[in-house]
Amino acid sequence: MRDFQIRELSRIAELAQPSVTNHLNALLKENLIIKEKKGIYPTFRANREDEMFKFYKKMDTLLMLKQTGFLDYIYDSCMPDSIILFGSASKGEDIAESDIDIFVQSPDKKLSLEKYEKTLNRKITLLFEENFSRLSKELKNNLLNGIILRGYLKAF
């Protein structure tokens, strides 16, 4: 997890330092970031333990999957019974290096994901299985606790 100083955030966001300070104060008030004093200047980082932070992180992932056309591509290519986001991204606990785990309830199919991986700046891992009952108990549990992106899961 990376810490940022106000000057660095100002350069990245292309905003004046007073504006960045105002935004940081609003995020601090919502407990979405953590402020620490390291040396002369304070640093800021995401509060990855906060439930609202995790919620916003999940919503951002869902929005990106939809806006990139990824979900439509999977659906149109495979016609699955369900598409499920599972793993760390479904909990809002993923980091920049995490992959995006997607279950596709359909027969296995070779798909070109490079375009979407480049746009999302993340590796996408697809798991295909037509018959939910063939999956391990652990994987079933992960899927049942995931987020259904399209269709519905026939668990029993």
Question: How would you label these PLM feature ranges?
Answer:
Residues 1-81, 90-97, 105-156:
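Catalytic core of pol beta-like nucleotidyltransferases
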